Amino acid sequence: YFAADGSVVPSISDWNLWVPLGILGIPTIWIALTYR
C-alpha cells in the first residue's frame, strides 16, 4: 500500500512473495553476470 508520504510500503503478503524470490533471484543474477 502507499504510505502518507507517498512511499510504497510492502504488506506482509508482499514480503512473503518477494523475499523468497529475492533469495532465489540474487544468486541467479550473480551467476549470470559472472559467467556471461
UniProtKB/Swiss-Prot annotation:
Cellular component annotations (GO), alphabetically ordered: light-harvesting complex
Which terms are listed as keywords in the entry?
Antenna complex, Light-harvesting polypeptide
Q: What is the effect of changing T34V?
A: In 33% of the molecules
Q: Could you tell me what this protein does? A: One of the components of the bacteriochlorophyll-protein complex in the chromatophore membrane.
The name under which this protein is listed is: Light-harvesting protein B-1015 gamma chain
Q: Which organism is it from?
A: Blastochloris viridis (Rhodopseudomonas viridis)
